[in-house]
A protein has these predicted regions:
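Active-site activation/catalytic loop segments of kinase-like enzymes and analogous catalytic loops
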Residues: 89-123, 137-155
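ATP/Mg2+ or Mg2+-diphosphate-binding catalytic cores
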Residues: 21-22, 30, 143-181
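Mechanochemical coupling/switch segment within NTP-driven translocation systems
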Residues: 32-42
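Short acidic/histidine-centered micro-motifs embedded in hydrophobic/aromatic stretches
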Residues: 8-15, 37, 135-138
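Active-site acidic catalytic loop and adjacent metal/ATP-binding pocket
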Residues: 40-90
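All-alpha amphipathic helical-bundle segments outside canonical DNA-binding/catalytic cores
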Residues: 124-136
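A cross-family kinase active-site recognition segment
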Residues: 1-30, 50-52, 161
Length: 181
């Protein structure tokens, strides 16, 4: 793991800083209640005794450049504005949301490939493996919070007003995900 850098936030996940504003909103009370319940249930996993270090925090397709060279695929990671010091497996949880969800559900072949590649470099502990569905769920709820904040509170966009609910459905599905291992 890379040594912690002074000044980086601790236990930050993309979308969590906006959650208090979302929780206070009365635009979608059912969503706000579900978000509050999920954060109360899942956030303790993020700050539990999992191995910690520097994480990217926003591993989605638009933050990756993939190119082939010499018969091998190479990945360049961009956009480190969400970087923080947190549970290392939290990055994997966010990557499951950003890279392995298709049509609102985890694509298990992609999940398996991501886990295999990750563990080829850094094996997960049993505790991390057990926490991963909760970390993925928390990541999806954090993204849902950001979408609500963005498309209802700061830049209202009626055509995107439903996206927070779609991500909430993803969160529930990721929490229920059973990992093979």
């Amino acid at each position: 793991a890379v040594p912690s850098l002074d000044g980086l936030p601790r236990d930050h996940l993309y979308g969590l800083p906006e959650a208090p504003l979302v929780l206070e909103s009365d635009i979608d009370p059912m969503f706000s209640r579900a978000l509050g319940d999920a954060l109360s249930r899942l956030h303790p996993v993020l700050v539990s005794g999992l191995p910690r270090g520097l994480i990217h925090g926003d591993l989605f397709h638009d933050n990756l450049l993939v190119h082939a060279e010499g018969g091998a695929a190479h990945v360049t990671i961009l956009d480190f504005e969400e970087a923080s010091v947190s549970a290392l497996a939290a990055d994997l949880g966010m990557a499951l949301v950003g890279l392995c969800v298709r049509d609102g559900a985890p694509e298990m072949a992609s999940v398996g490939a991501l886990l295999q590649g990750y563990e080829g470099v850094r094996p997960l502990s049993n505790l991390e493996r057990e926490a991963l569905p909760a970390l993925a769920g928390l990541s999806a709820w954090a993204c849902a919070s950001w979408r609500f904040w963005r498309y209802h509170l700061t830049r209202p966009m009626p055509e995107r007003a439903h996206l927070h609910r779609e991500m909430a459905t993803v969160a529930v599905r990721l929490e229920a995900m059973a990992l093979q291992g």
